[in-house]
UniProtKB/Swiss-Prot annotation:
It is an enzyme of class 3 (hydrolase). Its cofactor is Mg(2+); thiamine diphosphate. Residues 442-522 are annotated as: Thiamine pyrophosphate binding. Its EC number is 3.7.1.22. Binds 1 Mg(2+) ion per subunit. This is 3D-(3,5/4)-trihydroxycyclohexane-1,2-dione hydrolase. One of its GO terms (cellular component) is acetolactate synthase complex. PANTHER family: 3D-(3,5_4)-TRIHYDROXYCYCLOHEXANE-1,2-DIONE HYDROLASE, THIAMINE PYROPHOSPHATE ENZYMES.
C-alpha cells in the first residue's frame, strides 16, 4: 500500500481538493474554497497547509467568523447546493461565533463545512488560551456547542481519525435529504502531527447526487388521491429550486390547471408573471395565494418543510375535506401533516405523477378563481406601490399602534418615503437578472408579498432561521456564485448593526455588492408584533434614554449609515426622496466597488397580513386588557387550526 507522510491539516486540504459532485451527468468541483480567520488554534496547522499548497482552493480572509460562514452558506444556497466553501476558525470565541451560522445552515438544509480549531488532544498545556474548563468532563470544549446545530459532528483526536471523519462529512454534505452544517473539530496539536495516510484516501471522489425515484405504490396512491380532489393547490418549496425542477412544476401545473403558492425558499423558482403562480403563501403571503389555500381540498407540498410561516401555524387550510400530499426527498419532512408521502426527488416525482395523471385524463375544477385572485392582488399591489406620505391625515399600513411616530420620524429625518413605495420603485429600477437578498425584520414579509421576480433564481431569502445579520454576509456569498450579476442586500437598520463585517471582505476582494439599508430607527417588525398583541412600544424603537422617565422613550436615534460606510471605502448615497432613490440606483450600477444606499423609511409603512395568522406566545394573563383580548383571539384561532 502506497502512503503519503504529511500532517493532518495537509491531508485535510489535499482531500478537499479531490471532492466533486455529479448531477444529471454534469460534474462540479464541490469545495470551491475556504474562508479563514486565523488564531492560535488553526494558523500553524490549517494555516500552514494552506500557505504551502492550497491546490485549487480559493482562500478568503473573513472579518467575523459568523459573517464568513453566512457567506459560505449563501454561496451554497445560490449554487443549488452543488458547491460549497469551508470555514476555519480558532478555538474558543472564534469557534463559538460560527455556531449561529451552523444553525442557519442546518435549519435551511444548506451544506457548509466548518473546521474550528480545538484545544490540545494531549491536554499537556491545559487550560490553553480560550479553553472552557468543565470540571465534570474535561473532554468538553466550546466546539461541543456545535452538536445541537450540526447534521454531522466529529472531533479528530488522532491523525488517522481524519479519514473516517471526512468520508462521513462528505456523505452528509452531499446528501440532499440530510444536508446542513458539518462540523469537524480539529485539536491544534493534531493538525500539525504527521501520519502515513494511504494514497487511496486522496483519490478523486465523485459524489453522485441521485434523483431518487418514487415507489410505484406511492405514485398509485398519489394519483388516486389527486383524482378525488377538485381544487388542489401546490406549495412550491425550496426543494423545487435545489432539484432544478421548475420546468417540471410548470408542466404539472399547466397540464392539470393547478395553481401554486411559493414559500420564501421556493420564490423565484418560476417567474412571477407565470399565470398559475399565485405568489407568496402563508403568514407573509399575499391575498391571492392565501384565499385559494383557504378553500383548497388538497395541498401538494413539493420540497417544502411546512414551517409555521407557510401554514399560518396550521391555520391556513380551512376546507373540512383538505388532505395533504408531499413530494420530498426527506422522509422526515414528507411525513408532516399526516400527508400521503411520495419520498422522491422533486423533479422525478412531479414528472412521474404527471405522466400517470395525464394518462387518466385528470383536470382540476378551477374556473376563473385563479385569475380573479391574481387580479385582485395586482390591484392591491398597485395600491401598495403608490402609497405616499401626506403630512395631514396620513394613515400608515400598520395603523393604530403609535401613529405619531410617523410624523416624528418625518420631522427628524426629513424623509417621506414609505416602505411599499420604495419596494415598488426597486421592482422597476433593478435589472431583471439582479439578485435580491433578505433574511430578517419586516423586509422578508414585504418581499414575499410584493417582489415580482422576472427571472428565475433571483430571489434569495434565508427564512428558515431568519438570522439577523445574514443579509450583508450573504450578498458576498451570492456574488461569489453569480459574479456577472448585480447583487442587492435588502437589510434593516437593526440587522445591519448586528453584522456587516463581510462588507469589508467585498471591498478587499473587489467583489461588488450593493447594500439597500432601510432605516426606520428600530426593530420595526417586532414592534408591530408586540403592539398587535396588546403591548405598548417597549424597547423595540431606537431611542435615547429619557432622563425624566428613565425609560427608552426619548428622542429617536439618528445614525448616518452612509457616512459610516464611506469610511470603509464604500460608495454611499443618502436617500430621503424617490428622485434620490432613482439616482442612487442608476449611479450605483456604474460603480466598480461595493455601494451602500442609506434609505430613511417611515415606520409602520410596511405591509400588513392577508388572511393569515401566526401562533405566538401571548401572555395568558395581564393587567392590560388589550393583552387579554389578544390571548382570546389566539385561542379562537387555535380552535380552527390543526393540532399537529
Amino acid at each position: 500500500m502506497e502512503t503519503i507522510k504529511i500532517t493532518t491539516a495537509q491531508a485535510l486540504i489535499k482531500f478537499l481538493n479531490q471532492q466533486y459532485v455529479e448531477l444529471d451527468g454534469q460534474e462540479y468541483r464541490f469545495v470551491q474554497g475556504i474562508f479563514t480567520i486565523f488564531g492560535h488554534g488553526n494558523v500553524l496547522g490549517i494555516g500552514q497547509a494552506l500557505e504551502e499548497d492550497p491546490g485549487h482552493l480559493e482562500v478568503y480572509q473573513g472579518h467575523n467568523e459568523q459573517g464568513m460562514a453566512q457567506s459560505a452558506i449563501a454561496f451554497a444556497k445560490q449554487s443549488n447546493r452543488k458547491q460549497i466553501y469551508a470555514c476555519t476558525s480558532s478555538v474558543g470565541p472564534g469557534a463559538a461565533n460560527m455556531v449561529t451560522a451552523a444553525a442557519t445552515a442546518t435549519a435551511n438544509n444548506i451544506p457548509v463545512l466548518l473546521l474550528p480549531g480545538d484545544t490540545f488532544s494531549t491536554r499537556q498545556p491545559d487550560p490553553v488560551l480560550q479553553q472552557v474548563e468543565q470540571t465534570y468532563n474535561l473532554s468538553i470544549t466550546t466546539n461541543d456547542a456545535f452538536k445541537a446545530v450540526s447534521k454531522y459532528w466529529d472531533r479528530v483526536n488522532r491523525p488517522e481519525q481524519l479519514m473516517t471523519a471526512m468520508i462521513n462529512a462528505m456523505r452528509v454534505l452531499t446528501d440532499p435529504a440530510n444536508t446542513g452544517a458539518v462540523t469537524i473539530a480539529l485539536p491544534q496539536d493534531v493538525q500539525g502531527e504527521i501520519y502515513d495516510f494511504p494514497e487511496y484516501f486522496f483519490k478523486k471522489r465523485v459524489h453522485r447526487i441521485e434523483r431518487t425515484p418514487p415507489s410505484k405504490q406511492a405514485i398509485e396512491d398519489a394519483v388516486e388521491l389527486i383524482k378525488r380532489k377538485k381544487k388542489p393547490l401546490i406549495i412550491c418549496g425550496g426543494g423545487v429550486r435545489y432539484s432544478e425542477a421548475a420546468e417540471s412544476l410548470k408542466r404539472f401545473s399547466e397540464k392539470f390547471n393547478i395553481p401554486f403558492g411559493e414559500t420564501q425558499a421556493g420564490k423565484s423558482a418560476i417567474e412571477w408573471s407565470y399565470g398559475l403562480n399565485l405568489g407568496g403563501i402563508g403568514v407573509t403571503g399575499n391575498s391571492a395565494a392565501n384565499s385559494i389555500a383557504k378553500d383548497a381540498d388538497l395541498i401538494i407540498g413539493v420540497g417544502t418543510r411546512f414551517t409555521d410561516f407557510t401554514t399560518c401555524s396550521k391555520f391556513l387550510f380551512q376546507n373540512d375535506d383538505v388532505e395533504f400530499l408531499t413530494i420530498n426527498i426527506s422522509s422526515f419532512h414528507a411525513n408532516k401533516l399526516d400527508a400521503l408521502k411520495v419520498i422522491s426527488d422533486a423533479k422525478v416525482g412531479l414528472d412521474t405523477i404527471a405522466n400517470e395523471l395525464e394518462r387518466q385524463g385528470y383536470s382540476s375544477d378551477y374556473e376563473d378563481e385563479i385569475k380573479k385572485a391574481k387580479n385582485e392582488w395586482e390591484k392591491e399591489l398597485n395600491r401598495l406601490f403608490n402609497i405616499e406620505y401626506t403630512e395631514k391625515e396620513f394613515v400608515p399600513e400598520i395603523a393604530g399602534h403609535c401613529d405619531k411616530v410617523v410624523e416624528e420620524f418625518y420631522k427628524e429625518f426629513d424623509s417621506c418615503l414609505t416602505q411599499t413605495k420604495v419596494l415598488g420603485e426597486l421592482n422597476e429600477l433593478l435589472d431583471d437578472d439582479a439578485i435580491v437578498i433578505g433574511a430578517s425584520g419586516s423586509l422578508p414579509g414585504d418581499l414575499h408579498k410584493v417582489w415580482c421576480p422576472k427571472r428565475s433564481n433571483t430571489y434569495h431569502m434565508e427564512y428558515g432561521y431568519s438570522c439577523m445579520g445574514y443579509e450583508v454576509s450573504a450578498a458576498l456569498g451570492v456574488k461569489l456564485a453569480e459574479e456577472d450579476k448585480e447583487v442587492y442586500s435588502l437589510v434593516g437598520d437593526g440587522a445591519y448593526l448586528m453584522l456587516h463585517s463581510e462588507l469589508i471582505t467585498s471591498i478587499k476582494e473587489g467583489k461588488k455588492i450593493n447594500i439597500l439599508l432601510f432605516d426606520n430607527a428600530g426593530f420595526g417588525c417586532i414592534n408591530n408584533l408586540q403592539m398587535s398583541n396588546g403591548m405598548g412600544s417597549f424597547a423595540t424603537e431606537f431611542r435615547h434614554r429619557n432622563s425624566e422617565t428613565g425609560k427608552l422613550d426619548g428622542k429617536l436615534l439618528k445614525i448616518d449609515f452612509a457616512k459610516s460606510a464611506e469610511g470603509y471605502g464604500v460608495k454611499t448615497y443618502k436617500v430621503n426622496t424617490i428622485d434620490k432613490l432613482r439616482y442612487a440606483i442608476e449611479d450605483s450600477k456604474k460603480q466598480k466597488i461595493s455601494t451602500l444606499i442609506d434609505i430613511k423609511i417611515l415606520p409602520k409603512t410596511m405591509t400588513r397580513g392577508y388572511e393569515s395568522w401566526w401562533h405566538v406566545g401571548v401572555s395568558e394573563k395581564s393587567k392590560n386588557p388589550k393583552i387579554n383580548k389578544a390571548y382570546e383571539s389566539k385561542i379562537n384561532h387555535l380552535a380552527k387550526a390543526r393540532k399537529y
